[in-house]
A protein has these predicted regions:
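Bacterial N-terminal signal peptides
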Residues: 9-19
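Short acidic-glycine-tyrosine-enriched beta hairpin
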Residues: 39-44, 54-56, 86-103
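A short glycine-rich, His/Asp/Glu-containing loop-to-beta-strand
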Residues: 29-62, 68, 123
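Ligand-binding loop in jelly-roll beta-barrel domains
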Residues: 89, 104-130
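Bacterial N-terminal signal peptides that target proteins for export
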Residues: 1-11
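Glycine- and acidic-residue-biased ligand/ion/polar-headgroup-sensing regions
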Residues: 68-87, 94-96
Length: 138
């Protein structure tokens, strides 16, 4: 195996890992991979970031993240209504953030506005071997 083959395989694996968080999101929003990198001083952990763009009134399906994944979510623009586990629904405005514990169920994630788009940055810290970071709730 030469270095180019190894590099291609690594790039393919990283692209897959970045794209997987989009699995639970519906057609009305766009999930764009932003960043993925192993955390050098925490062996076995990686940092993955995605940007979720919500059209006016758009919502994600209820979903759960990998059991190892800590999620920090930051509202870049607009307003996002969110409910994690059995907690209350809350509207977060641009500049506000929230946190999801590993294995939590994200019951509601939607654009709170019917007229203005919204954007969310989601940052995952998870086990490097967890390739499926988001799973829809059926």
């Amino acid at each position: 195996m030469n270095i180019q083959t190894i590099a291609r395989a690594a790039c393919t694996a990283m692209a897959f890992a970045i794209a997987v968080p989009a699995a639970a999101h519906g057609a009305a929003e766009t999930v764009t991979p932003n960043f993925q990198h192993a955390i050098p001083n925490i062996p076995g952990k990686s940092l993955t970031a995605v940007v979720v763009d919500y059209a006016p009134g758009a919502a994600s399906s209820a979903h759960r993240h990998a059991g190892s994944a800590f999620i920090y979510a930051y509202v870049v623009s607009g307003e996002i209504e969110s409910q994690v586990d059995d907690g209350p629904k809350r509207v977060y405005h641009a500049g506000e953030s929230f946190f999801e514990e590993p294995g939590a169920v994200h019951r509601t994630s939607r654009n709170a506005s019917e007229t203005t788009p919204a954007k969310l940055l989601a940052v995952f810290v998870a086990d490097t071997n967890d390739k499926v970071l988001t799973t829809p709730i059926k």
